[in-house]
Regions:
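Short alpha-helix immediately C-terminal to the canonical SAM-binding loop
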Residues: 42-46
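Short phosphate-binding/catalytic loops that engage adenosine nucleotides
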Residues: 32, 53, 147-150
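C-terminal target-recognition/interaction regions appended to catalytic cores
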Residues: 222-348
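Conserved proline-anchored active-site loop of SAM-dependent methyltransferases
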Residues: 13-27, 60, 70-87, 114-120, ...
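Conserved SAM-binding strand-loop segment of SAM-dependent methyltransferases
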Residues: 53-60
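Class I S-adenosyl-L-methionine
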Residues: 63-73, 83-259
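Conserved SAM-binding motif I beta-strand of class I
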Residues: 34-39
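Phosphate-coordination loops involved in phosphoryl transfer and adenosine-cofactor binding
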Residues: 8-10
Length: 348
């Protein structure tokens, strides 16, 4: 069994689909102790080990419930690509979309006091294979588990309401075991002080991971015409690639997409995605013709500067954008974790 040794009386946490550790970082900060973590992605594993600790790298289907230690709370950020607007939206028809059932299998055996699921907004409009809404399936699975079940609350949260300099909507489910007789109250929204990009991008030169993934010649040509706060709509027609000309010619048909958004220093950033492509996420620096560096993207996701990434090869540089884009912003995780700690575990 791969599990971290127990060190103290902190509430014990099992983390499934841990990614590079954004969610876990927030929960550790709130006072939880991670006793088991798992993720199948090797790039995410490497970053997790570098910063947080040991992580099981096996396919979750192959992990027996008996190999996972007992815990007070179980968290799971099961793969979001099947439900994401940035992905193909196959939902439960993508094999990854059914991975939450592996969480249910493990929860049913462990019955922790608290369960936390995190996923993208698209999950809310996803149908299960029997035609029911997937959120209803998740709630039913947890509510009726083992004759005890969980009181489940869920809410669509915008990370920018919880100290994250990014408009990033995520749905969070929190289930409290019914014998505890409490219902979770989500944390109140916080003031959006100092969340604009001008505060994020002021980085001392000695902070690590200040390397950027290069742009293609076509991308460079496009962004040279995009002013701070602008988008592809500012690019002269003659400098557009053929496929963008086709879209520009029929904006109504294509629902007026806003590609190549270049957020200004006085704005909160748009959603950072795993693909890190300027076409579909706010990845272009406000004043320089380049992608954000790894550190800049990490700051937008509220990873502290002490949290390290692996940038020794071009392959690893590209991979770091993926794992950061897939992560739960650490400050959002902390806000949820702190509320759980105060409502359920404080004073035990």
């Amino acid at each position: 069994m791969l599990a971290m040794a127990k060190k103290n009386n902190k509430p014990k946490m099992v983390s499934l689909f841990s990614g590079c550790g954004g969610l876990d970082l927030g929960f550790e900060r709130a006072g939880f102790e991670i006793v088991f973590a798992n993720d199948f992605d090797k790039d995410a594993q490497a970053v997790y080990r570098l910063n947080i600790g040991e992580i099981d790298g096996r396919d979750i289907h192959t992990i027996s419930e008996t190999e996972i230690p007992d815990c007070d709370i179980l968290t799971a950020g099961f793969p979001c690509q099947p439900f994401s607007n940035a992905g193909n939206r196959k939902g439960v028809h993508d094999s990854r979309g059914m991975l939450y059932k592996e969480c249910i299998r493990i929860i049913s055996e462990k019955m922790p006091k608290v369960v936390v699921f995190e996923n993208v907004k698209g999950l809310l409009s996803t149908k299960y294979i029997d035609g029911r809404n997937l959120p209803d399936v998740i709630i039913d699975d947890l509510s009726n588990m083992n004759g005890v079940g969980y009181n489940v609350q869920h809410r669509l949260l915008n990370a920018s309401d919880y100290g994250v300099p990014q408009n990033r909507q995520r749905v969070v489910f929190v289930g409290i075991r019914k014998d505890i007789a409490k219902e979770f109250i989500f944390p109140v929204e916080q003031p959006k002080d100092k969340l604009t990009l001008k505060y994020v991008l002021d980085i001392p030169s000695d902070v690590p991971n200040q390397v950027a993934w290069g742009l293609s010649p076509q991308q460079i040509e496009m962004i040279e015409y995009i002013p701070e706060g602008g988008s592809w709509k500012d690019v002269p027609y003659e400098h557009l690639a053929p496929r963008f000309k086709k879209i520009r010619d029929n904006m109504k048909k294509y629902h007026s997409p806003n590609f190549y958004r270049r957020f200004s220093r006085d704005e909160i950033c748009g959603t950072i995605t795993a693909s890190a492509q300027p076409e579909n996420c706010g990845i272009i620096h406000p004043t320089e013709n380049r992608r954000y560096t790894i550190r800049e993207v990490a700051r937008i996701q509220t990873f502290p500067d002490s949290f390290l990434f692996i940038d020794d090869t071009q392959k690893n540089i590209t991979a770091m954008y993926k794992v950061i884009g897939n992560a739960v912003p650490a400050n959002l995780a902390y806000a949820v974790a702190k509320a759980i700690m105060e409502q359920i575990f404080r004073g035990e």
